[in-house]
Amino acid sequence: MKKYIIIGIIALVLILGGGAFALFSSLTGGPWEGTWWGVQEAGMNWSGDHIKTLETFTFTKNDDKTISVEHRVQQGSKEVEGRLSGSGTIDGGRLIVTTKRGKEVTFSYARIDKTIETPLKNVDKTAVTIKPLTEENNADMEEIRSEIVKISQKPENAIDTTLSSARS
């Protein structure tokens, strides 16, 4: 008899715990809100610099249950709009986004490490993952941004735009 009571109590605790987790997840808005950031490892350039691209994504819930995605990319000293900006819908732990160019891409949320896997790839073909921007990691993000700008401003990385003219 005691064995059945203990099993019943364990089952009840598991059911209540799962319900509480589901309620908490739905009330906190899930991962598809706020600003998230990550770094794309792009390899080495011709002058031996380790090239990185800072990727930031801002997810905004709309009244029609869609999610607006604003993708920004730090390219050298400029921050430009990324190619993954668009509008998406939630499908379980995934966000399916139709970009402004009409391409459909998928973002996947990993609950265990609380990161989002993007469709972007690093030089080693692994997916670029992003994490939420917080006060604690904002300094890390800005340090990476400053490294990217510094590398782009090195004289050996300047693009020569002068045209040479050959005389015959």
Label the model's feature ranges.
Residues M1-I15:
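N-terminal Sec-pathway targeting helices
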Residues T28-E55:
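Tryptophan-anchored aromatic micro-motifs
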Residues H50-K52, S77, K100-E104, K121-K125:
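Glycine-centered tight beta-turn/hairpin loop motif at sheet-sheet or coil-to-beta transitions
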